[in-house]
Each structure stands twice: as structure tokens, then as C-alpha cells.
Amino acid sequence: MSGQVTLQSSDSVDITVERAVAERSMLIKNLLEDLGESEEPVPIPNVNESVLKKVIEWCTHHKNDPQSTGEDDDNRRRTTEIDEWDQKFMQVDQEMLFEIILAANYLDIKALLDVGCKTVANMIKGKSPEEIRKTFNIQNDFTPEEEDQIRRENEWAEDR
């Protein structure tokens, strides 16, 4: 079993990384097991070079973390706390943040997906619908009447 693996981004850039780093992705880990020993680059068709490099940076930092067993999922999901290194890592523009989340989902890196989703959750926590729309540049397509109806239907969920 070789110590290195080459990943090929969607824009055809080859990036060589430690196998242990690449195997933080369950997709890549399963692919490597299925392919056996191969010098061929592993194609990652849905992730471009800049996003793949960010994902690899995260995987390198977390390569010695225990893989998620599923049992710790409930505890992990209940909190929106993010460790300091991950918070700094996620200080990127919105487009890159969403690209990282999509890549983590595609590559099946649950812990990175969690960190990305918690980052977004923390961005909207405590904000009004108007503030959330402004944060994410979302157009309001409700009429004032529809907005009033939705507000009445969801009164129970509002913090008072």
C-alpha cells in the first residue's frame, strides 16, 4: 500500500497527498480499496482545484482524528460549537464556504460537512428573515399578504 495518492480535480489539476489524508474522504477511501494499487490519478469530477486544495488542507489538519462511528453523531449534531482552527479555516467568502460544503458532501467527509453546516447555522442564528436574506443575497418573492400569513402560521416558533 503506497503512502501517496494523486487526486485529479475537475479542472484537470493533479494534487499528490498522503493516502491517510485522502482517506478522510469515505468516497476516496472506498475508491482506493476498489481500485487496488494504481499509479493513475483518482478523478474528482465535482471539485475544482482551489476547493480541493482547501479540503485537503482540512483533511491534513484532521488526518489523525478518529473516523466518525455514527454513535457520536447525535452529540455532534446537537451543538453548533466549532473548534478554533476550524473557525479560522471557514473564514472564507460565501461562495468558497458553499463549495467546501458541497465538496464535503460529495466526498463523504462527515466531519467537514458538519463544520461547514454549523458555520452557516451560526451565520443565521438569531437573525430575522430580512437579515438572513441580506446575508445570503436572497430575493424576497412573497407578497406582503403571503408574508403576514406565514408570520401568523409560525408565531409559535418565534422567540419572544
Curated annotation (Swiss-Prot):
One of its GO terms (biological process) is protein ubiquitination. Residues 101-160 are annotated as: Interaction with the F-box domain of F-box proteins. Keywords: Ubl conjugation pathway. Pathway: Protein modification; protein ubiquitination. Coiled coil: none annotated. Transmembrane segments: none annotated. Gene3D superfamilies: Potassium Channel Kv1.1, Chain A. Essential component of the SCF (SKP1-CUL1-F-box protein) E3 ubiquitin ligase complexes, which mediate the ubiquitination and subsequent proteasomal degradation of target proteins. Controls sulfur metabolite repression, probably by mediating the inactivation or degradation of the metR transcription factor. Component of the SCF (SKP1-CUL1-F-box protein) E3 ubiquitin ligase complexes. Belongs to the SKP1 family. This is E3 ubiquitin ligase complex SCF subunit sconC. It comes from Talaromyces marneffei (strain ATCC 18224 / CBS 334.59 / QM 7333). The gene is sconC.
